Amino acid sequence: MAMTLLEDWCRGMDVNSQRALLVWGIPVNCDETEIEETLQAAMPQVSYRVLGRMFWREENAKAALLELTGTVDYSLIPREMPGKGGLWKVVFKPPTSDAEFLERLHLFLAREGWTVQDVARVLGFQNPAPAPGPEMPAEMLNYILDNVIQPLVESIWYKKLTLFSGRDIPGPGEETFDSWLEHSNEVIEEWQVSDIEKRRRLMESLRGPAADVIRILKTNNPAITTAECLKALEQVFGSVESSRDAQVRFLNTYQNPGEKLSSYVIRLEPLLQKVVDKGAIDKDNVNQARLEQVIAGANHSGALRRQLWLTGATEGPAPNLFQLLVQIREEEAKEEEEEAEAALLQLGLEGHF
């Protein structure tokens, strides 16, 4: 659970999870100064900066995300550190060592009947690199890692798309178009490769009629881009919805019971963008439309909704999506801390009886 939180938090802040620490088990009543003093005392030789703190409801405690800012000796990072209220837990993902990585690479290539020289030749290098070994100079090893192994890793180990065929009844392992498209857009954005490679990976996920559509388009236009392929699939297999229908669906989407307001805003955003794409809302008015619907659709009756109402009542421009989420998340964190403090106070009162 802690590792999942570390990975999700890093992904949300665009931070390399192998350059971050998650410290948790911090008491709710522990302030920023106490947290910093504890971290410095436990890791005096580790260079870091605190990216943020949050209340972790499942643990009824705070958690802090740290980014490692310098050269790191992971042996200096404790798995636990003494702090206020007891031991604080530390979670991190140390990167795989070069030796372990090379060993795993050799095993993989051996199973496939390949050598590093074969890989270099396939990738188009004029002078195939020698096989890496412990006696190899550091400059040559770095060259192989950067120019041979890294392209190989990127082309073999990557997050794959789910399957989509376009059939009326999806087959085993296949998804409906809307869920497939949403997942595909997220994954494709993460791929750090050429558009040609993205298109190849996209084709891997297609079956049946969907694959036939892209093959026909590629035959007519060999230079078709990945974005154009996705657009064509949306036109063929996407739901046919008028601008009026899209707007009605957007305006009738409300916050669910128990759903965080920030989660509601994120769930609302694709519906808003669809309304904008169909021309029902002008792009210049998208921030105002979002704010008005969040105020109207929220079932939150506390200070957070009042603050949003005051934001909408001001004469200034409405906040954009990022600004709105930051405002909401900050208020949610305050409310969670207040709830936790109230719960602790209640437990203390009950302990006196």
Curated annotation (Swiss-Prot):
| Tissue specificity as recorded in UniProt | Testis and brain specific.
Q: Which domain of life is it from?
A: Eukaryota
UniProt-listed GO biological process terms: inflammatory response to antigenic stimulus
Principal location listed in the UniProt entry: nucleus
Question: Any one cellular component term from GO for this entry?
Answer: nucleolus
Give the record's keywords alphabetically.
Nucleus
Query: What Pfam families does its record include?
Result: PNMA (PF14893), PNMA_N (PF20846)
Q: Which InterPro entries match?
A: PNMA (IPR026523), PNMA_C (IPR048270), PNMA_N (IPR048271)
Question: What compartments host this protein?
Answer: Nucleus, Nucleolus
The answer to keyword Ubl conjugation applying to this record is no
Q: What is the similarity comment for this entry?
A: Belongs to the PNMA family.
Protein name in UniProt: Paraneoplastic antigen Ma1 homolog
What is the species of this protein? Answer: Rattus norvegicus
Q: Upper taxonomic classification of the species?
A: Eukaryota, Metazoa, Chordata, Craniata, Vertebrata
